[in-house]
């Protein structure tokens, strides 16, 4: 813990900084990377414990803690524990989401509502995900998924427009081919 020997009264920002348990400004990225690697490896219990530890460790820094909460909810969703994921999501909705954690939450909410078969809300959050996505191939995949969601909701025109967006993004051949086939089926 760093020394703080100023004689004056501490500001709120200084109090928050001194109440932290971790002072390395880049270590949270290592924790997040470790949890994500465990998640993608399929070790959801290990990933959930890593993200739970991150939430406790960085509780004074909302942007980091909320990212970890989003990934913890993803772990629960992948394990089929929708009730636990819903508990985290309702807690998140009660509090305001930090703008730096918004993208992770949109991904998580999209995944949750797809698993819960609430396709209307999934489409709303998937639209938000598409707005923030920078990678062209990933954006094409998300538009394709949005087209599939609209198809399952019997919104044929919206599905057609979503598949048309996939073709506009000039994705790899197999993605474009599947989008054109889906356009002809709608």
Please tell me what each predicted stretch does.
Residues 1-186:
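Acidic, polar-rich low-complexity tracts and alpha-helical solenoid repeat scaffolds
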């Amino acid at each position: 813990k760093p020394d703080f020997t100023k004689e004056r009264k501490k500001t709120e920002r200084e109090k928050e900084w001194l109440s932290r348990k971790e002072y390395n400004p880049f270590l949270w990225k290592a924790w997040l990377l470790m949890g994500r690697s465990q998640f993608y490896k399929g070790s959801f219990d290990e990933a959930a414990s890593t993200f739970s530890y991150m939430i406790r460790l960085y509780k004074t820094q909302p942007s980091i803690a909320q990212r970890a909460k989003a990934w913890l909810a993803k772990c629960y969703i992948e394990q089929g524990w929708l009730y636990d994921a819903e508990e985290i999501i309702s807690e998140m909705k009660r509090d305001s989401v930090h703008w730096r954690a918004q993208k992770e939450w949109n991904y998580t909410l999209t995944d949750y509502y797809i698993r819960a078969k609430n396709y209307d809300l999934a489409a709303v959050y998937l639209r938000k995900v598409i707005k923030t996505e920078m990678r062209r191939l990933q954006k094409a995949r998300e538009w394709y998924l949005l087209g599939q969601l609209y198809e399952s909701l019997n919104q044929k025109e919206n599905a057609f427009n979503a598949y048309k967006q996939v073709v506009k993004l000039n994705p790899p051949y197999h993605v474009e081919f599947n989008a054109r086939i889906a356009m002809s089926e709608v």
